């Protein structure tokens, strides 16, 4: 009887374990498929795949991971992988923007805005992963010597959510980049078509000119030389007439300028004479008054000097 109960208990536990582990497999299947696509895609996808592999390793929460999470090594490596991913993504985006030059400005701006938003979401997802690991390290260090099972469970749950969000945003970014690339290809094809449309009339004109030259080649050389001489003569006469007209205009303009200069010089001369006369009328009375004062002063000085040199009468008489 005990053996029967033991067999039933083992069967029940095995069934429970199968029910618990069963939902995990479909969850990781798209992730593995997405990882395989990244490893065979663009350089930015390869860099994101390396970030993804590192995140899967961290999510195992093995003993080695637990030890390294207590040091900044994990976050430093994640930062390096993040920077590498964003750098490759920006380079790929710049390459696509160069190919989008023939596309309309409005379309290019809209695609660029959507791609920047998707790129920002992917960067924010990776930044959340790093921030969560930094927070976990701080919490573990604060609970040193205590049980961290609850912290590990919370971290595992957060990492699963962040990984799903990262997968979703990376897939969205891939789709938008595909649209971006399709727009670049379409723009390049439109550019080629536009060039072909512009070159078509030129080619036709060249064909017409070639036909005209061929027909002219059949004419006698003397007739063509005579026609060319007449055209040159008419052209020279036209240029000579224009030159003479231009010279006449220049002469008239020079005469007008000379007349204006002479008139201005005469006006300036009259103004100078009037100003000189005005100055003379101002200063002549002043000069005459100064001369009179000076003469009076000289007379007074002479009188004073004469009085001082007169002989003094003697008292002997």
Curated annotation (Swiss-Prot):
Post-translational modification comment from the UniProt entry? APOE exists as multiple glycosylated and sialylated glycoforms within cells and in plasma. The extent of glycosylation and sialylation are tissue and context specific. Glycated in plasma VLDL.
Q: Where is this region: LDL and other lipoprotein receptors binding?
A: 158-168
Query: Which cell locations does it reside in?
Result: Secreted; Secreted, Extracellular space; Secreted, Extracellular space, Extracellular matrix; Extracellular vesicle
Species of origin reads: Papio anubis (Olive baboon)
Annotated binding of heparin, by residue: 162-165, 229-236
> Sites of the modification Phosphoserine?
147
What is the protein name given in its UniProt record?
Answer: Apolipoprotein E
In this chain, the stretch annotated as Specificity for association with VLDL covers: 278-290
Binding partners and assembly: Homotetramer. May interact with ABCA1; functionally associated with ABCA1 in the biogenesis of HDLs. May interact with APP/A4 amyloid-beta peptide; the interaction is extremely stable in vitro but its physiological significance is unclear. May interact with MAPT. May interact with MAP2. In the cerebrospinal fluid, interacts with secreted SORL1. Interacts with PMEL; this allows the loading of PMEL luminal fragment on ILVs to induce fibril nucleation.
For whether the record's keyword set contains Flavoprotein, the answer is no
Q: Give the Methionine sulfoxide positions (modified residues).
A: 143
Gene, per the UniProt record: APOE
Q: Where is this region: 8 X 22 AA approximate tandem repeats?
A: 80-255
Q: Which GO terms describe its molecular function?
A: amyloid-beta binding; antioxidant activity; cholesterol transfer activity; enzyme binding; heparan sulfate proteoglycan binding; heparin binding; identical protein binding; lipoprotein particle binding
> What GO CC terms are in its UniProt record?
chylomicron remnant; endoplasmic reticulum; extracellular exosome; extracellular matrix; extracellular space; glutamatergic synapse; Golgi apparatus; high-density lipoprotein particle
Function as written in the Swiss-Prot or TrEMBL entry? APOE is an apolipoprotein, a protein associating with lipid particles, that mainly functions in lipoprotein-mediated lipid transport between organs via the plasma and interstitial fluids. APOE is a core component of plasma lipoproteins and is involved in their production, conversion and clearance. Apolipoproteins are amphipathic molecules that interact both with lipids of the lipoprotein particle core and the aqueous environment of the plasma.
């Amino acid at each position: 009887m005990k053996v029967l109960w033991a067999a039933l208990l083992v069967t029940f536990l095995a069934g429970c374990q199968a029910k618990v582990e069963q939902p995990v497999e479909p969850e990781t299947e798209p992730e593995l498929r997405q990882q395989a696509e990244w490893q065979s895609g663009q350089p930015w996808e390869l860099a994101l795949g390396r970030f993804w592999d590192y995140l899967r390793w961290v999510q195992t929460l093995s003993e080695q991971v637990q030890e390294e999470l207590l040091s900044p090594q994990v976050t430093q490596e994640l930062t390096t992988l993040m920077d590498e991913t964003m750098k490759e993504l920006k380079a790929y985006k710049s390459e696509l923007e160069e190919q989008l030059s023939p596309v309309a400005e409005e379309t290019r701006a809209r695609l660029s805005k959507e791609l920047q938003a998707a790129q920002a979401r992917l960067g924010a997802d990776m930044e959340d992963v790093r921030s969560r690991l930094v927070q976990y390290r701080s919490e573990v260090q604060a609970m040193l010597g205590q049980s961290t099972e609850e912290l590990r469970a919370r971290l595992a749950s957060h990492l699963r959510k962040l990984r799903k969000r990262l997968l979703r945003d990376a897939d969205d970014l891939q789709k938008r980049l595909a649209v971006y690339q399709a727009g670049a290809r379409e723009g390049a094809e439109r550019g080629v078509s536009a060039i072909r449309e512009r070159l078509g009339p030129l080619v036709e004109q060249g064909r017409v000119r070639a036909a005209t030259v061929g027909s002219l080649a059949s004419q006698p050389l003397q007739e063509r030389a005579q026609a060319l001489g007449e055209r040159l003569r008419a052209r020279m006469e036209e240029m000579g007439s224009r030159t003479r007209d231009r010279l006449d205009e220049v002469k008239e303009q020079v005469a007008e300028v000379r007349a204006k200069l002479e008139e201005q010089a005469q006006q300036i001369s009259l103004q100078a004479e009037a100003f000189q006369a005005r100055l003379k009328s101002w200063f002549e009375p002043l000069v005459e008054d100064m001369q009179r004062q000076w003469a009076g002063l000289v007379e007074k000085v002479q009188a004073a000097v004469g009085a001082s040199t007169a002989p003094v009468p003697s008292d002997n008489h």
